[in-house]
């Protein structure tokens, strides 16, 4: 919410979120609920994927690498998939772009990063 407010961007202007997506039951539902609290219960045009599904958790480098992937998504107008997503947990019902990358027209993309000990950060990128 703060990233959007600071940028002067409305939630409905964001087309893609590169989620932290650690594939843990508690973490995935918490992130899904946070996304829904800002973007609505079932945001129709919002794609959410986790680049972490393809590379694992890079610990201290995760936020930087995921930001680069988010920027490349805007440049290439292609959303990377969440691989190996066959049966999302109950309540995890967003468009997680399963298995296959998707072409998409995007102007804004958000990257979520959560750290050990409760540090959270989200950064909003705009296509230029």
Predicted feature residues:
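Conserved "HGTGT" condensation-loop signature of ketosynthase/thiolase-family condensing enzymes
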Residues: 1-128
């Amino acid at each position: 919410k703060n990233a959007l407010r600071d940028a002067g961007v409305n939630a409905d202007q964001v087309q893609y979120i590169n989620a932290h997506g650690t594939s843990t039951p508690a973490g995935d539902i918490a992130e899904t609920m946070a996304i829904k609290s800002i973007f609505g219960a079932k945001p129709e045009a919002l794609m959410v994927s986790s680049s972490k599904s393809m590379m694992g958790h890079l610990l201290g480098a995760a936020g930087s690498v995921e930001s680069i992937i988010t920027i490349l998504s805007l440049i290439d107008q292609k959303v990377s998939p969440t691989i190996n997503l066959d049966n999302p947990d109950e309540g995890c019902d967003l468009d997680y772009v399963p298995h296959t990358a998707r072409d998409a027209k995007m102007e804004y993309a958000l990257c979520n990063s959560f750290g050990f000990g409760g540090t959270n950060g989200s950064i909003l990128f705009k296509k230029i």
